[in-house]
């Protein structure tokens, strides 16, 4: 309780300090009685008077709540200056990114993306509840994720494999480029295949996407050689690039994870490449900032 309240005082500004202390005292009294409440109150009041409370943390691990494992990797790969910039950027709130399925759609409170014509940006909002989302005129998809489908240079008639497809954002985006072509979307788990199907139906591209339960490291064994004109390998990775939206990711990583993921990624690429036609294109994408 003390740690949580001190963190709230130091790093969160929506609740006044006096209110944070008062709430902590009430919780302590309710849980452990008046003596504990008096102790909590004394410690927090003393901390508020302390000359140290307004000091900037001297290390990145404390200031940005970033584990040493990830900090060391960042510094090795990017250097100190760039690492500081990355850490600062991760503290900023993430915006909402939409993909236009209907190119004529206009959504109040959004602005055009500078990265891609397909994206609209908003500072906040629950767009999944809008009529435009429900009717399949827009979907929620990160800007950078929307850069992937154009890289496959789809002309309309291709046989496409999305090797690691869930939840289906890139599959449905690729489907927008197809006329007579077709996408086979793979995942290991039934509930994730259901997500792909739901997204495809909402966006009215279910006739262009077939989901299949399969291990992406066994693509060649499943489909044989020279099967696909285009293959997307949106490989499983550490997901460090998603920290702003999923801050808990940073606390669930061990050094062995990066080595294990590299092996899986290579197995997927090796197997997928054997099922690619000789004139085909394979695109490899991840949502991490690290080399691994």
Regions found by a protein language model. Name each.
Residues 1-292:
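S-adenosylmethionine
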């Amino acid at each position: 309780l003390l740690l949580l309240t001190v963190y709230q005082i130091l790093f969160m500004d929506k609740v006044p300090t006096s209110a944070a202390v008062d709430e902590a005292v009430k919780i302590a009294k309710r849980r452990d009685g008046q003596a504990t409440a008096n102790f909590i109150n004394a410690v927090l009041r003393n901390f508020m008077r302390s000359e140290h409370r307004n000091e900037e943390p001297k290390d990145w691990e404390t200031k940005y709540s970033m584990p040493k494992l990830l900090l060391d990797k960042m510094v090795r790969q990017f250097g100190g200056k760039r690492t500081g910039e990355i850490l600062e950027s991760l503290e900023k709130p993430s915006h909402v990114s939409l993909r236009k399925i209907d190119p004529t759609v206009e959504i109040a409170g959004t602005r055009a993306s500078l990265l891609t014509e397909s994206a609209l940006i908003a500072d906040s909002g629950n767009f999944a509840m809008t009529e435009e989302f429900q009717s399949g005129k827009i979907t929620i998809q990160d800007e950078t994720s929307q850069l992937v489908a154009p890289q496959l240079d789809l002309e309309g008639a291709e046989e496409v494999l999305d090797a690691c497809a869930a939840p289906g954002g890139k599959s449905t985006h690729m489907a927008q480029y197809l006329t007579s072509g077709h996408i086979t979307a793979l995942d290991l788990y039934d509930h994730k295949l259901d997500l792909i199907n739901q997204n495809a139906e909402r966006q009215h591209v279910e006739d262009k996407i077939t989901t299949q339960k399969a291990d992406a490291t066994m693509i060649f064994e499943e489909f044989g050689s020279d099967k696909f004109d285009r293959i997307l390998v949106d490989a499983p990775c550490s997901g460090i690039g998603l920290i702003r939206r999923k801050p808990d990711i940073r606390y669930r990583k061990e050094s062995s994870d990066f080595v294990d993921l590299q092996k899986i990624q290579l197995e997927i690429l090796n197997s997928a490449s054997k099922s690619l036609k000789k004139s085909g294109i394979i695109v490899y994408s991840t949502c991490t900032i690290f080399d691994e």
